[in-house]
């Protein structure tokens, strides 16, 4: 990891007038982050899968902070939709100051997308990785923030087996692997894209819709000991708005503090292999 430089994105004045893209913006952490950055004066760009919830959050942001944000629908379980989203965003915005790659999910049983990938690694990692690559030029001088989790310690990343075909499926391990991939990708992006401040973060255990339709859903939605979505989004919003000189590009953060990683997650050589494997998987090797 290398120290960040002050030209990366946000000055001390906050997010006023900055373009902030939030994926997974229709519920939970993404929704809370969108509302928070809008209150700081950002031009918010929402991305979500469900059109009704997307309209609801669009209206909530407009009521909170004035003008309605831009909203784009895309299902990250289909890479074709992600590519189309990338084209639309490139056409619309000459610059994106912050990309908060937050879309994610948990799948209780093994699910394969129409692209041929295990759904957890595609929705939580590969789709966001592809979108960041498609927006590479728009992110120059800006920030890339990847939502991760301390569940990364349960991950078993293998660049030669992104689908985890060599092991019996475990929802928890698949989720942890996807979050491990995000930490490693932020670190590798910092090495490959020096003009982008790339970081990942752990939001804490948050009351969200994750795991909907599974036995885990009630735990994540109703457990009184879990954090609120607003609290879970706090580090994301801080990473988007803090002075660049206070942050470390490539770093993994928890509760606004740089948090060390170890083992395979800290292996730069493995991260480079993951980057190349991901690029080949999504069919984009230009960056």
UniProtKB/Swiss-Prot annotation:
| A Pfam family matched in the record | adh_short
Q: Which family does it belong to?
A: Belongs to the short-chain dehydrogenases/reductases (SDR) family.
Residues binding NADP(+) are: 24-30
Give the organism, scientific name: Streptomyces peucetius
Q: Per its UniProt record, what SUPFAM superfamilies does this chain match?
A: NAD(P)-binding Rossmann-fold domains (SSF51735)
Explain the purpose of this protein.
Answer: Could reduce the 13-carbonyl of daunorubicin to yield (13S)-13-dihydrodaunorubicin. Could also be able to reduce the 13-carbonyl of doxorubicin.
Query: Which InterPro entries is this protein grouped with?
Result: NAD(P)-bd_dom_sf, SDR_fam
The active site is formed by: 175
Where, in this chain's numbering, is substrate bound?
149
Instruction: Look at the named UniProt entry and state the broad enzyme category this protein falls under.
Output: oxidoreductase
State the protein's name: Putative daunorubicin C-13 ketoreductase DnrU
Which GO terms of the molecular function aspect are on file?
oxidoreductase activity, acting on the CH-OH group of donors, NAD or NADP as acceptor
Q: Which Gene3D superfamilies match?
A: NAD(P)-binding Rossmann-like Domain (3.40.50.720)
Q: What is its EC number?
A: 1.1.1.-
Which keywords are on file for this protein? NAD, NADP, Oxidoreductase
